[in-house]
Amino acid sequence: MRTRVKFCGITRREDAIQAIRLGADAIGLVFYPESPRAVSPQQAYQIVRELPPFVTVVGLFVNAASCYLQQILDKVPIDILQFHGEESPEECGYYGRSYIKAIRMAEGVDLPSLARSYESASALLLDAYQAGVPGGTGRAFDWRRIPKNFSKAVILAGGLTPENIAQAVRQVRPYAVDVSGGVERIKGVKDAAKMAAFMRGVDSVN
């Protein structure tokens, strides 16, 4: 099965268009005000309106108030929600949308148990753990910690770069990979050459 690709932390229309030209399946928009990659609803709408059909738009939230999240949904056509905080399964499912739950791979994380708890999730996104940081750490975790034949679709994140992505896909065989900082020039601004190299790395294994 082909591993899908999501470029996250998109803040500019031109980066979104470049991602799609390179063959990305999805883009991620960050609605977490504390992130250097955060976008306003107006920015997000201007990006999304330029996208061609069949591109998945993912909205990333961290412990967002339901009224704030609903305001975003009212203004921006988002296909999938991505939760990066301590949201419960009930909170994730409240909006009646497909959702991804991010799991930070701290010591002792019980993935089979979390898969049961978040049974309604479309996938679990596995990211590196850093205390006090909900994501975008630029660090990788030990991919051997992912159980073989895991019951949920896995989206691999955390410290992925053009240099290690082929190895990551070959070893984990994830449903999808999610990259942000590994293909940036500066935080929030993507590097077209790095994006292209990342896609080549995925395609070399696919």
From Swiss-Prot:
One of its GO terms (molecular function) is phosphoribosylanthranilate isomerase activity. Keywords: Amino-acid biosynthesis, Aromatic amino acid biosynthesis, Isomerase, Tryptophan biosynthesis. It catalyses: N-(5-phospho-beta-D-ribosyl)anthranilate = 1-(2-carboxyphenylamino)-1-deoxy-D-ribulose 5-phosphate. Pathway: Amino-acid biosynthesis; L-tryptophan biosynthesis; L-tryptophan from chorismate: step 3/5. It holds the Pfam family PRAI. GO terms for biological process: L-tryptophan biosynthetic process. This is N-(5'-phosphoribosyl)anthranilate isomerase. It comes from Nitrosococcus oceani (strain ATCC 19707 / BCRC 17464 / JCM 30415 / NCIMB 11848 / C-107). The gene is trpF.
